Amino acid sequence: MKVLILQGSPRANGSTAWMAEQCKKAAEAAGHDVTLVNVARKKIAGCLACEYCHGKGNGACIQKDDMQELYPLMAEADALVLAVPIYYFTLAAQLQAPIQRMYCVNKPAKVHKMALLMSSYSPGVYAGAMAEYHDICNYWGVEDCGIVTAKNDEQKTDETRQKIADLVAKF
């Protein structure tokens, strides 16, 4: 199975990056073909709502930025993992842009499983991101394989590593 992990934290050595790396290791150990992309390091603009993609573009976005690298990866992925820090109640902007740019293709062609990894230093801030994630799963018609959250002292622990491995086992 091809697994695509979109990591949305600008902090290269932060908790979200660690969670994404643990997911990659667990998925590779399970025999999956894994691609990990730090979308926070990419130049991906938000959707312009210009509708070029649904007219002359025939499914292609008019914007020629780093999202062009992600479209083929999304098209080939069987499973998609979103790894994101929660700064203020919802998915971080760095991950919002690539998700919303999928508008031009409507839904990823092969993705049938999804998972969400979230980190935060504040308790009680995950509900908005969880609701958005569940909406994406429902709209795309994909199986929700689970959510792993890690706050404060839960970050970068063996317990969190095991929760991520258990989530990957659902792929």
Q: Each PLM stretch: what is its role?
A:
Residues 8, 39, 118-121, 149-150:
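Cofactor-binding loop segments of dinucleotide-utilizing enzymes, especially the Rossmann-like FAD-
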Residues 83-84, 129:
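A general marker of short, structured functional hotspots
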Residues 86-88, 121-122:
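Short glycine-rich anion-binding loops that position phosphate/pyrophosphate groups of nucleotides
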Residues 106-147:
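Short, glycine-/small-residue-rich phosphate/pyrophosphate-handling segment
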Residues 1-83, 89-104, 154-171:
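N-terminal beta1-alpha1-beta2 submodule of the flavodoxin-like/Rossmannoid cofactor-binding fold
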Residues 33-38, 142-150:
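Short beta-strand elements in bilobed, periplasmic/extracellular small-molecule ligand-binding domains
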